[in-house]
Amino acid sequence: MVSNPDGYINLCEIDPMTGKQLSSSKRIWNGTGGRYAEGPHIYKKDGWYYLLISEGGTELGHKVTIARSRYIDGPYQGNPANPILTHANESGQSSPIQGTGHADLVEGTDGSWWMVCLAYRVMPGMHHTLGRETYLAPVRWDKDAWPVVNGNGTISLKMDVPTLPQQKMKGRPERIDFKEGRLSPEWIHLQNPEAKNYTFTKDGKLRLIATPVTLSDWKSPTFVALRQEHFDMEASVPVVLQKAGANDEAGISVFMEFHSHYDLFVRQDKDRKRSVGLRYKLGEITHCAKEVSLPADGEVELVVKSDINYYYFGYKVNGIYYDLGKMNTRYLSTETAGGFTGVVLGLYAVSVSKESKMYADFEYFKYKGK
């Protein structure tokens, strides 16, 4: 069962062992008229086949709709109350949660029903920099055997539900050390990374081998990142350049797309004098907003803070904090920059030439959300 770029849902039989298609594809539902009818799920309950899909695209018009049939290949009849979940209406349009969609239905071991879906949190002005997140909402079945989500087809940051068995989830530690000699699964790269450019030292530091591929190239730079999970947060990382040539650099990037990122970096000139700088890339514009000299000695720790309005950039030398400036959050939002996977905080190393032997060592990465 797949979505079609023309905006309808197809069904065919496959061999679950090989994936081979065993029957021709059949159109079974067009949805309710929203664009991008996609993400189909089928469930059998009480003699009905329920077809759950998403429409509207993963934007403000996202919605979840449902149809059913006595036969798996149709005909399917839509729920008169569609959409069963959306915030593109009077009830949901002022919610801090938007873009609800791509849902699934789950029955608990106690017989309760739930919907899991994705959505994103917005800032004032309906901009969002955080990526899509997973939400859970209670479901009941009405007298006509249709599912009703959270009473009114919307979700909230807090919902009153029957208590389920509780299990405390282990969160991300505020300080991430690299002593284990490996990166945990939540670390991500751009494109297909060159594994040889990511190593670990004997004393437990992450070592990034610089290449001439920059963060604005449609390739895979030496870059490894974690997702920003909070509007209000603080991240910091110490950076040590080794064997750096003139203008080789390493640092931390607040990264949305190849064409939209803020870079906080350390580099040195031809006389091996160190500096720290703040640069932004927004569309066709690349500009170094500020760059200042660093003392010859002393550990440099790069610091990025944020709230709903700004990213704040600075650095510490020998534990003393210095401010470098701020940049508006909305320039990295989906609504301005495009994309929809959210901002990441990435450690990177870039050299001027292929002949450079530069690498950068990172002892730890700190992240604290508020």
Task: Give residue spans per PLM region.
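Carbohydrate-active catalytic/glycan-binding domains of CAZyme proteins
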Residues: 1-370
